[in-house]
Design a protein with these regions (language model features):
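Single-stranded RNA-binding surfaces
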Residues: 1-179
Length: 179
Protein backbone atom coordinates (compact mmCIF):
# COMPACT_ATOMS: atom_id res chain seq x y z
CA UNK A 1 0.00 0.00 0.00
CA UNK A 2 0.97 3.59 -0.44
CA UNK A 3 -0.15 5.24 2.76
CA UNK A 4 0.12 8.57 4.51
CA UNK A 5 1.45 9.11 8.04
CA UNK A 6 -1.53 10.33 10.05
CA UNK A 7 0.06 10.54 13.50
CA UNK A 8 3.46 10.03 15.11
CA UNK A 9 3.61 8.71 18.67
CA UNK A 10 7.17 9.07 20.03
CA UNK A 11 6.09 7.51 23.36
CA UNK A 12 5.14 4.32 21.48
CA UNK A 13 8.06 4.59 19.08
CA UNK A 14 5.60 4.25 16.23
CA UNK A 15 3.53 6.02 13.63
CA UNK A 16 -0.03 5.50 12.52
CA UNK A 17 -0.51 5.25 8.77
CA UNK A 18 -3.70 5.80 6.81
CA UNK A 19 -3.58 3.21 4.03
CA UNK A 20 -7.25 3.01 3.15
CA UNK A 21 -8.41 0.48 5.74
CA UNK A 22 -11.13 1.21 8.29
CA UNK A 23 -8.50 1.82 10.99
CA UNK A 24 -5.09 3.37 10.53
CA UNK A 25 -2.21 0.90 10.63
CA UNK A 26 0.48 0.75 13.30
CA UNK A 27 4.07 1.15 12.04
CA UNK A 28 6.70 0.61 14.77
CA UNK A 29 10.15 2.18 14.47
CA UNK A 30 11.83 -1.23 14.03
CA UNK A 31 9.79 -1.74 10.85
CA UNK A 32 11.21 1.36 9.14
CA UNK A 33 13.40 0.56 6.13
CA UNK A 34 16.80 2.34 5.95
CA UNK A 35 15.54 4.76 3.28
CA UNK A 36 13.34 6.42 5.94
CA UNK A 37 16.16 6.90 8.45
CA UNK A 38 17.92 10.28 8.57
CA UNK A 39 20.99 10.44 6.34
CA UNK A 40 22.99 12.58 8.77
CA UNK A 41 23.06 10.89 12.18
CA UNK A 42 26.08 12.78 13.56
CA UNK A 43 25.69 13.68 17.22
CA UNK A 44 22.55 11.58 17.60
CA UNK A 45 22.92 8.66 19.95
CA UNK A 46 19.32 7.56 19.61
CA UNK A 47 17.06 8.16 16.69
CA UNK A 48 13.37 8.67 17.33
CA UNK A 49 10.58 7.89 14.91
CA UNK A 50 9.84 11.64 14.73
CA UNK A 51 13.36 12.07 13.26
CA UNK A 52 12.40 9.70 10.43
CA UNK A 53 8.80 10.46 9.53
CA UNK A 54 6.53 13.48 9.47
CA UNK A 55 2.77 13.91 9.49
CA UNK A 56 1.23 13.56 6.01
CA UNK A 57 4.41 11.95 4.62
CA UNK A 58 3.67 9.27 2.04
CA UNK A 59 5.15 5.85 2.72
CA UNK A 60 5.00 2.41 1.12
CA UNK A 61 3.91 -0.24 3.61
CA UNK A 62 2.81 -3.85 3.70
CA UNK A 63 0.37 -5.39 6.18
CA UNK A 64 2.13 -7.87 8.48
CA UNK A 65 -0.87 -8.60 10.68
CA UNK A 66 -4.49 -7.81 9.80
CA UNK A 67 -6.54 -5.54 12.03
CA UNK A 68 -8.32 -7.27 14.91
CA UNK A 69 -10.94 -5.96 17.28
CA UNK A 70 -10.22 -2.31 17.93
CA UNK A 71 -6.58 -2.51 16.80
CA UNK A 72 -5.43 -1.45 13.36
CA UNK A 73 -3.21 -3.58 11.16
CA UNK A 74 0.48 -4.03 12.01
CA UNK A 75 2.55 -2.56 9.16
CA UNK A 76 6.10 -2.77 7.88
CA UNK A 77 8.02 -0.75 5.32
CA UNK A 78 10.16 -3.84 4.59
CA UNK A 79 7.75 -5.04 1.91
CA UNK A 80 8.27 -8.20 -0.12
CA UNK A 81 7.13 -9.39 -3.53
CA UNK A 82 6.51 -13.09 -4.11
CA UNK A 83 7.32 -14.60 -7.47
CA UNK A 84 7.09 -18.15 -8.73
CA UNK A 85 10.38 -19.33 -7.28
CA UNK A 86 11.65 -16.37 -5.26
CA UNK A 87 10.56 -13.72 -2.79
CA UNK A 88 12.17 -10.32 -3.41
CA UNK A 89 12.76 -7.98 -0.48
CA UNK A 90 13.62 -4.68 -2.21
CA UNK A 91 14.81 -2.72 0.83
CA UNK A 92 16.20 -5.48 3.03
CA UNK A 93 19.68 -6.58 1.88
CA UNK A 94 20.39 -8.62 5.03
CA UNK A 95 17.32 -10.79 4.52
CA UNK A 96 17.35 -13.76 2.25
CA UNK A 97 18.28 -17.35 1.90
CA UNK A 98 16.44 -20.55 1.22
CA UNK A 99 13.08 -21.83 2.40
CA UNK A 100 13.34 -23.62 5.74
CA UNK A 101 11.43 -26.55 4.24
CA UNK A 102 14.36 -27.38 1.95
CA UNK A 103 17.09 -29.50 3.56
CA UNK A 104 20.21 -31.52 2.80
CA UNK A 105 21.83 -31.70 -0.62
CA UNK A 106 18.94 -29.81 -2.22
CA UNK A 107 19.66 -26.90 0.12
CA UNK A 108 23.35 -26.95 -0.81
CA UNK A 109 22.48 -26.91 -4.53
CA UNK A 110 20.17 -23.93 -4.03
CA UNK A 111 22.82 -22.08 -1.99
CA UNK A 112 25.11 -22.41 -4.99
CA UNK A 113 22.37 -21.20 -7.35
CA UNK A 114 21.58 -18.30 -5.00
CA UNK A 115 25.20 -17.18 -4.95
CA UNK A 116 25.22 -17.06 -8.76
CA UNK A 117 22.19 -14.74 -8.96
CA UNK A 118 22.71 -11.10 -9.86
CA UNK A 119 20.90 -9.57 -6.87
CA UNK A 120 20.95 -5.76 -6.82
CA UNK A 121 22.58 -4.01 -3.89
CA UNK A 122 20.16 -3.23 -1.02
CA UNK A 123 17.88 -6.15 -1.92
CA UNK A 124 17.40 -9.60 -0.49
CA UNK A 125 16.02 -12.80 -2.00
CA UNK A 126 14.55 -15.99 -0.55
CA UNK A 127 14.28 -19.10 -2.72
CA UNK A 128 10.83 -20.64 -2.20
CA UNK A 129 10.14 -24.38 -2.15
CA UNK A 130 8.82 -24.01 -5.71
CA UNK A 131 12.39 -23.08 -6.68
CA UNK A 132 13.56 -26.60 -5.90
CA UNK A 133 15.00 -28.24 -9.01
CA UNK A 134 15.08 -24.97 -10.94
CA UNK A 135 18.19 -23.83 -12.76
CA UNK A 136 20.06 -20.65 -11.90
CA UNK A 137 18.81 -19.29 -15.23
CA UNK A 138 15.17 -19.86 -14.25
CA UNK A 139 15.76 -18.31 -10.81
CA UNK A 140 17.47 -15.28 -12.39
CA UNK A 141 14.55 -14.91 -14.78
CA UNK A 142 12.10 -14.85 -11.85
CA UNK A 143 14.31 -12.31 -10.05
CA UNK A 144 14.42 -10.08 -13.13
CA UNK A 145 10.62 -10.29 -13.41
CA UNK A 146 10.21 -9.28 -9.74
CA UNK A 147 12.63 -6.37 -10.12
CA UNK A 148 10.69 -5.09 -13.15
CA UNK A 149 7.42 -5.49 -11.26
CA UNK A 150 8.87 -3.54 -8.32
CA UNK A 151 10.00 -0.73 -10.65
CA UNK A 152 6.50 -0.52 -12.14
CA UNK A 153 4.93 -0.43 -8.66
CA UNK A 154 7.28 2.35 -7.55
CA UNK A 155 6.52 4.39 -10.68
CA UNK A 156 2.80 3.98 -10.06
CA UNK A 157 3.26 4.89 -6.38
CA UNK A 158 5.03 8.12 -7.34
CA UNK A 159 2.27 9.23 -9.70
CA UNK A 160 -0.87 8.13 -7.80
CA UNK A 161 -2.67 9.13 -4.66
CA UNK A 162 -2.19 6.97 -1.63
CA UNK A 163 -4.06 3.70 -0.92
CA UNK A 164 -2.40 1.97 -3.84
CA UNK A 165 -2.80 -1.77 -3.32
CA UNK A 166 -0.67 -4.42 -4.93
CA UNK A 167 -1.45 -8.05 -4.32
CA UNK A 168 0.51 -10.61 -6.24
CA UNK A 169 -1.50 -13.81 -6.20
CA UNK A 170 0.25 -16.88 -7.51
CA UNK A 171 -2.66 -17.65 -9.84
CA UNK A 172 -3.02 -14.11 -11.24
CA UNK A 173 0.40 -13.23 -12.61
CA UNK A 174 -0.23 -11.60 -15.93
CA UNK A 175 2.63 -12.11 -18.34
CA UNK A 176 4.70 -14.21 -15.97
CA UNK A 177 5.71 -17.04 -18.27
CA UNK A 178 8.54 -19.48 -17.71
CA UNK A 179 11.74 -18.99 -19.72
Amino acid sequence: YKGKVSRIEPSLGAAFVDFGAERHGFLPFKELAPQYLPKDRKGKERISIKDCLSKDQEIIVQVEKDERGNKGAALTSFYSLAGRYLVLMPNNPRAGGISKRIEGEERDELKEALSSLDIPKNMGVIIRTAGLGRSAKELQWDLNYLIQYMIILLRIAITTQFYLLSQMKQDRKVGHQRP
